[in-house]
Amino acid sequence: METLTTLYLMINRLFSTLLFLSCLFGGLSQTAKAQNNEWENPTKYEWNKEKPHADFRLYERTDDAVNDNPQKSSWQYSLNGTWKFVYAPSIAESIKDFYCTDLSDNDWDTITVPSNWEIQGFGEPIIRNIQYVFSPNPPYIDVDNPVGTYRRTFTVPQNWQGREVLLHFGSISGYARIYVNGQQVGMTKASKTPAEFNVTNYLKKGEN
């Protein structure tokens, strides 16, 4: 019997992220060149992330698999929908203790996931296909980039007990760090590609 279950999440636009599944993730970028920042280090592009694999979905019944309707599978739980969100134009203005489970989000904005935050009124949309919108100086980021901090809660279905749980991101733009219940799970820089993390040991009974 298949022993995996999947939390599906599709994010189409983050510059970078920090996800804390209670659920929170926020975008990170730019600081001084003198610091050896993870997001400016080309040798560090991921950690604690599942290896890439062919796309698949989990189903209990053959008919559901043939029809390929993920909403019919009890082994998948979508996190798409309304999330709490804070936008900051630079890392200096971003939330520093975003991963704390007791951090109140009552005054946060909301955002629809999946989506680009620019088309929901945060930041400025950039449309450019022939050259950079900044002077490239790899691996350093010499200009401020926006930070998006996302959060939402969910409850793990009871029939998932004893199974491994993967958190699946369909797409993230840029650098992302993922947190669950206040604990850092992993990191990815593979922009616009799926990213999965095994969050089994970070979950708890009831609300996460």
Where are these regions (language model features)?
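Bacterial Sec-dependent N-terminal signal peptides
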Residues: 1-36
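Short helical patches
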Residues: 4-7, 122-124, 130
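N-terminal pre-domain segments of enzymes
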Residues: 35-78, 82-84, 91
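Accessory beta-strand-rich segments of carbohydrate-active enzymes
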Residues: 38, 44-49, 69-70, 84-88, ...
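Short Gly/aromatic-enriched secondary-structure transition segments
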Residues: 94-107, 111-113
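Non-catalytic accessory segments of hydrolases
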Residues: 108-111, 116, 123-128
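Surface-exposed acidic, glycine/proline-enriched linker/cap segments
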Residues: 130-138
